[in-house]
Amino acid sequence: MIRQEETICAIITPPGTGGVSVIRLSGKDAISIASRVFRKKSGKSLRDAKTNSIQYGHILDSSTGAVLDEVLVGIMKAPHSYTCEDVAEVSCHGGPFITGRILEVFVREGARLAEPGEFTRRAFLNGRIDLAQAEAVIGLINSKTEEGLRSAIWQLEGSISRKINELRDSLTAALASLEAFIDFPEEDIDVAIHDIKGRVHSSIESIDRLIEGYYRWRPFREGIVTAIVGRTNVGKSSLLNLLLGEERAIVTPHPGTTRDIVDGLANVAGLPLRILDTAGLRATEDMVEEEGIRRMYKSIDSSELVLLVIDGSEPLTEWDEELLKRTEGKKKVIIVNKIDKGNVVQDGLSTSSAPVVCTAIIQGEGIDLLRKIIRDTVAGKEKGIAGETIVTNLRHKNALEHSKMELNNFLEALHNKLPLEIQALHLRGALDSLGEITGIVTTEDILDRVFSEFCIGK
């Protein structure tokens, strides 16, 4: 059980050696604890510092009085802080030993180590942010593309919350009308039912759009599993290294160099690709290489996108034809590489339904067009999230689906003329599911699941 009345502390910068580390204290005794082990030349106490101020001085070992480090301490007094509590943030030199020593001092003075996500959990419990905004913090930290960053920022700024609150306001009005007729059955219900049904149908349409957006933008959120395939020495590893921006695969003129599948995450025109580079296909008696080819076939089957690389300077081979056949029905882009040495295969690909891009990868020719074609193949002509309300969280999507189910149950109960109390029960269920998204309706179990995804220090 997390004890919110206690003062907590944690290192909030990444572990390891760096220029600066930051240790955060939050709670009613945060400034008092920091003040007891902080000294500045003027002798003034941190308790007297103005909120949102930075104080220069030294942190002392409370057991010996020895100076531990030269620091800056940021003071934020409740409610004007991330947690809406008194907060002291100590910026010290970035070594794991010294930050550990300072953390030990704070614990000795009465703070306890924070649980994962506990600072953000307190921000939620103290009303600074709702649960959807709290989850946006994780999205912001984990974003890998511009689209992911923007969607997380909009969620943090309340775009999801505002939409959910609009839905709840409309359905709350519908429920209030329905409950009025439970209390006063002699009233004429027909006019009110027309309004209630209109609100419910409108809410279902809005929920459908939100759920559709979740699936439409799944590639931007989770990335697309992508297999780079082709016969040996056609430029697969060069393409992999180009997309990743680093040398993850050995590039040599010798066939058969890449014998294993190489994982990597690439940002291609704002679309994250989870890339698999595979062993090239050719006739071989090498058992190790044969295993690589077998795994290539497996990666084709499990991938969502195939980048099929063909050597444009040579006629199509039986292995090229084999891969073209093997990838039929898959979402794919055909890359005709080495066109700086000639292009004798493009006409032979004219019947392919997949887009064909001509490149000279090592020379950098055709790469911008390739990036655009890859994105268009996966996401169509979508230009981006463009300010629309996007559901990016599986928990939110599940809650929306449950809310929609309850609304459909209400319409069925209404059609079957079931008692008003049962109809109202379904409307309340829809409202509760929406409330779980923002935390208006929540349980300790939901909070534990949400904040277990956070790291210590956030």
Sequence positions of predicted segments:
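A glycine-rich (often HGG/GG-containing) alpha/beta subdomain
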Residues: M1-R150, W154, G158, V333
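C-terminal-of-GTPase-core extension/linker across diverse P-loop GTPases
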Residues: I2-I11, P15, H58, E146-N267, ...
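Short beta->alpha junction loops/turns
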Residues: S26-G27, G95, P255, G312-S313, ...
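Switch I (G2) and immediately adjacent beta-strands of P-loop GTPase domains
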Residues: I54-K77, G256-T284, S299-L305
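Conserved beta-strand segments of alpha/beta enzyme cores
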Residues: R112, P272-R274, P355
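Short glycine-/small-residue-rich Rossmann-like dinucleotide-binding loops
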Residues: L244, A279-G280, E304, D311-G312, ...
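Generic enzyme active-site microenvironment
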Residues: I275, V309, I335
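Inter-motif core of Ras-like GTPase G domains
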Residues: E289-S313
